[in-house]
Amino acid sequence: MKGFAMAERNPLIIMAAGKGSRMKASADVPEWVLEEAASRPKAMIRIGQDRKPLLQHLVERAKEEGLRDICIVVAEHDEITRPHFDALRPDGIDLSFVVQTIPPGRTKPAGTAQAVQLALEAHPHWDGSSVTVANGDNLPPSGMFQAMLANPACLPAFDRDHLGLPADRVQAFAVISRNDQGGLERIDEKPDEATIQSAIWPDGTVRVSMNYFRVPYGDLLEAVRTVPEHPVRKEKELPVALSNWSEGHPDGLHVLPLAGAFLDLTHPQDIVKAGERLDQGGFELRI
């Protein structure tokens, strides 16, 4: 697997434009946590004893596991992320940034699929490589990126009972079903209980998407360019683009069953918990 990884460019797009709208005030956390959540992009919240941003941990993890050409998508008016990495000057990787602006006539960006489209169009030299897409506000178990590099097109499907996250949060995660050939059958967003029951795997697990996947450059670019806006939210959504592409390429997206816990920043309490877990050594992948 490692030889395969090092033989390719292995580009990575990290979605880091989230503002952390659910980082509301809470009496259960110290004041410094609330200040951190209110003053920084969610991916740049500092955790652990070394006070290193979560996004920096993610970039370092990706580099260690063979992804050396990294593009970070940041929000308009983000004055923290790029200056941090410019000062850091991480070696051994090609690090670039794309800004997702708010189009005229809108109050928010045009969606996650549009963010990926911007990153792809800014890197035409990636054509011919498979592109990994990552979520900037959580940290996967170590080994996940390397496991993904063995497949030109894959979607990790994590056992939801071993994510290390609160059950009420996990309950809302998109569930993944795969066919007998190991390809993606469907992704069900915000599943109800009946949908969850229908998605139980033969081994008794329910497996969910953590918003990481890998698809060849040309296929991914076509998928995000052609996905329609959601009729209500008026956004071009990445899960829809991925599902649409998969429907047109039967067995094209390999579902990779994995297990392991994530560090996730959704609520202020997560900042303290993630830091404590990181100081203890983080999490390992189980395949």
Task: Place the predicted regions along the sequence by residue.
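Conserved N-terminal catalytic core of the sugar/cofactor nucleotidyltransferase
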Residues: 2-14, 22-28, 32-35, 48-130
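Conserved alpha/beta core of the MobA/IspD/sugar-nucleotide pyrophosphorylase nucleotidyltransferase superfamily
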Residues: 4-12, 187-287
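Active-site glycine-centered loops adjacent to acidic/histidine catalytic or metal-binding residues
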Residues: 18, 137, 159, 267
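A structural signal for short hydrophobic beta-strand segments in well-ordered beta-sheet cores
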Residues: 44, 175-178, 255
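Phosphate- and divalent-cation-binding pockets in alpha/beta enzyme and binding domains
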Residues: 80-83, 143, 241, 273
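A short acidic, often aromatic-flanked loop/helix-cap motif at beta-alpha or helix-coil junctions
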Residues: 101-108, 162-164, 194-195, 261-264
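Short beta-strand-to-loop acidic/aromatic patch adjacent to the donor-nucleotide binding site
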Residues: 128-139
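Conserved core of the sugar-phosphate nucleotidyltransferase
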Residues: 139-223
